[in-house]
From Swiss-Prot:
This is NADH-ubiquinone oxidoreductase chain 5. The keyword Translocase applies. It is an enzyme of class 7 (translocase). Its EC number is 7.1.1.2. The chain crosses the membrane at residues 4-24, 45-65, 88-108, 118-138, 141-161, 172-192, 202-222, 243-263, 275-295, 327-349, 372-392, 406-426, 459-476, 490-510, 585-605.
Amino acid sequence: MNYIFNLSYFMILLLLLYPLILPLCQKFFDKNLEKHTKWAIKLSFFISLIPLTLFIDQGIQTIIMNISWIHLPLFNINLSFKFDMYSIMFTSVALYVTWSILDFTSWYMYSDPNINRFFKYLLLFLITMILLVTANNMFQLFIGWEGVGIMSFLLIGWWYGRADANTAALQAVIYNRIGDIGLILSMIWLATNLNSWEMNQFMVLSKNLNLTIPLLGLILAATGKSAQFGLHPWLPSAMEGPTPVSALLHSSTMVVAGIFLLVRLNPLFQNNKEILTVCLCLGALTTLFTAICALTQNDIKKIIAFSTSSQLGLMMVTIGLNQPYLAFLHVCTHAFFKAMLFLCSGSIIHSLNNEQDIRKMGGLNNILPFTSSCMVLGSLALTGMPFLAGFFSKDAIIESLNTSYLNAWALILTLIATSFTAIYSLRLISFTMMGHPRFLPVSPINENHKLLKNPLKRLAYGSILAGFIITSNIPHNKSMIMTMPPLMKLMALLVTIVGLLLALELANLTTKQFKILPNMKMHNFSNMLGYYPPIIHRFLPKMSLKWGQTIATHTMDLNWYEKTGPKMTELNQKIIKIIHSPQKGVIKTYLTLSLLSIITLLVFFNLSLNHS
C-alpha cells in the first residue's frame, strides 16, 4: 500500500516537473509548452485519484515517507512527506481546479507574448503548494510557504509595465513578510526547545509545555498568508494581476496556505483555550469587516476578492471552534465556486473590452447566458444555498458555532457576515446580469470558445457535487450533534434569506431619496475599506517621515549648529584663558614653573640611577 502511495505521488511530481525541465533540453518543445502543461496537470489529477480511492476504500489514516537529507550532531532534517486525509484530498482538488484554470488561461491570455513563461509560473505555484500540504516537517513546509509567496509576487506583478501591478505585488510581499516573521520565530522556538522540526515528534514532545508564544507566531503567519484582519489589504490589491492568477491564488493555493497550516498543526493548540479564542475572535472580525467592505465595491474582481477574505475569516472561526475538519471541508468546497466566479468575471471583462466596473455592465443575462448561469450558480454556492457545495461546509460551520456554547459575540458577527454575503452576491448579479446594457455597443462579446466553456462546466459540476461527494466519503474526526432545535438548524439559511430580502429592500430605497445630500458615513466607511489603507499606507508613513524630519532638523539646530557656532566660541575662550593665565609677566609665576621643572628632572634622574 505504501508503495502505491509513494509511486503515485512520485509520478505526479515527475509529470508536473516535466514541462519545466524539458524546454532546457529541447528548444522546439517551448512552442508546445502550453499544451504539454495542460496534459501534465490532467494526467496528474487522474493519477491522484488512485491514492484517494485507496484511502477511502481501505480506511487508511496516515502514511509517512522519510528520506534522509541533512545530518547535524544535535539536529536532523529529513525530507518527510505525509499522506493523510488533508494532503490527499487537497492535492486532487488543487489539480482539478488548476486544470480548469490553465484551460481558461489559454483563451484569456492567448495574445500575451510571454504566455509560456506564465504557464511555468502557474505550474511552479501549484508545485510549491503541493509541497506545502504534503510536508511533514517545518523546514519543508517553510520551503513551500516561501515558494507560494515568491510565485504570487511574480504573478501579481505580471503586467510590470503598470505601476499599480508593481505596487500590489510589493504590497503582497511586505504583508506576507510580516506574517513570515511569526512562522520563523515559531520554528526557532521549536528547534531550541524541542530540538526537532518533525511534526509527529514535536506534537508528542510538546504535550506538557506552554506553547502560547510559538502558537501566536503561527497565528501571525496565518494572518499574513490568509489575509486576516490587520494584514488583509494586500488581497484586494492583488486583483491587479491577470484573472487566472486571481482564480488560482484565491481558490487552491496561497490564501488557503495559512488556514491549512493551522489545520495541519491543530493538535498543538486544541487544548489551549487562549489561542482558540484568539482564532475565533480574529476570524469573526475578519469575516464581518471584509463582508462590509464588499457591500459597496464597484470593481467586479474586488467584490469576489473580499468575499474570499470573508470566507477565510469563516475558516478561521472554525479553527477557533476546534473543528479543523470543517475548516478543511470549506477550503475544498470553496475552491470550486470561487475559481468559477473568477473565471466568470474574466469572461465578462474580456467580452466588455477590459471593463471591470459593474456600474457599466448590465443585461448580460441575455448576451452571455452561459457565463451568467455559472455566475449565478457560483454566487448561490457562496451564499450557502441548500445542496450546493458551499451548503455542506458553511451550514455545518454555522451549526457548530450555534451549539458550541462559546463566544456569543463571535456568533453574532459571523451570522451578520453570512447575511451580508447574500447582499453583495445579489448586488453583483443585479448589476451585471439584470437591467439594461450600460456598456459600449462595440464590445467584442463572445463566449462560444471551448477553452472558456469547458473549464466553467467542470467547475460548475464541482460547485454542485463536490460538497456531497466529499462529505459522503471522508469520515468526520468528531462526533456530530444529532439533535438540535429547528431554528438553530436552519439559522444559516434564515440569515441568508434575511440578507436577500434586505438587499431587495435597499435596492428599492435607492429610488426614494428623501434628502438632496444624504448621510453617507456608513457607505464611505465601506467604500473606503474602513479607512484602513488611507491610514496605514498614507497617514502613518507621512507622519513617520514628518517626525523623522522634525527630529533630524531639531537635533541639528539644537546640537550641531549650536556646538559648532556659539558654544564653540565659548569653548575657545575658556581654552584661551587657561593658556593665557600663566603668561601675565609676574616673576613669581616664572620662578615657580622653573623650580617645578628642575625638581621633576631631579626626581626622574634619581629614579633612573636607582633602577640601573
